[in-house]
Amino acid sequence: MALYSWVQRGWRCGQTWAPLLGGGYRELSATQARQLLGRRFNLLLQQKCGFRKAPRKVEPRRSDTGSSGEAYKRSALIPPLEETVFYPSPYPVRTLLKPFFFTVGFTGCAFGSAAIWQYESLKSRVQSYFDGIKADWLDSIRPQKEGNLRKEINKWWNSLSDGQRTVTGIIAANALVFCLWRVPSLHRTMIRYFTSNPASKVLCSPMLLSTFSHFSLFHMAANMYVLWSFSTSIVNILGQEQFVAVYLSAGVISNFVSYVCKVATGRYGPSLGASGAIMTVLAAVCTKIPEGRLAIIFLPVFTFTAGNALKAIIAMDTAGMILGWKFFDHAAHLGGALFGIWYITYGHELIWKNREPLVKIWHEIRTNGPKKGGGSK
């Protein structure tokens, strides 16, 4: 989820954030915060904002305690704590200008690319239909060479719905980024580009990249489970190409809403996770099918309508944003949910059904192309 994480300026005991089982984030001690930056940590012997005695001839500093009680030095590959502290701009409103234009530009490019992708998909389906007839004839006259494993993989893949096939790529991207977090030498890069924070020097690219970023395995698993569960419904409603455009745009838009809230309240801090985009998917499905029945994974006996679930989620995130709850990035959740509701209600008619001019231009480019000698057709 797009959740508050790690180090805040002027950190004290209980001012740092890290993953909490259940998909959320909780307050951790100073010692635990350093573990996120690549330092060794022992859960049984953790310190709670305490100082260890300074070693001889070494400047006093905070240190973690290993299982043997010795202090471990910070690796040279991991940035010192001071380099990960974020300093807000003295002009907070100006900070939002670049993210705003990036959000508008990226959203436009996402839907434009999706329209062209759909056009190319339709053309390729026609061609693949005739190629399939030829391939079936060739397969019937020559022996099969596929192994059992390949047959099982093909059988599993063909059993998936269009939505499940689509989100498989998204899940794979999230898993790859999760693995990168496990490499200590990449922590500096991951914090800079895969966590979104309006106080960071890099503002725009993390708005997209942080949508695929999870530090906690449980956090990623919970998000991907929800995405997988709603994938068939959302792709049936929007189609594969439109869904991808909505999902990517939702990640950027929800992060921009988070930026606005952080700047307005002065509560800066890095966020990461796919929750903003997933909230858009959930809100879109619940708005389109409000009478659908939903259940909690561990409490399948208790069911409720999709419409009521959406209202409860919006109410909780609104309260969390107003009251300053810090377990989740409630502003990003709320921004994603409102975007999903708006898109199903108005955005589909306003954006997707007006894509024809762009598709016609692309068709002309593909059909005519540049002519030699500058002649026209």
Swiss-Prot record:
Gene3D superfamilies assigned to the protein according to its UniProt record, in alphabetical order: Rhomboid-like
A single MF term (Gene Ontology): endopeptidase activity
Membrane topology field: Multi-pass membrane protein
Primary enzyme class: hydrolase
Family: Belongs to the peptidase S54 family.
Protein name: Presenilin-associated rhomboid-like protein, mitochondrial
Organism: Rattus norvegicus (Rat)
A biological process from GO: neuron differentiation
Source organism, top-level taxon: Eukaryota
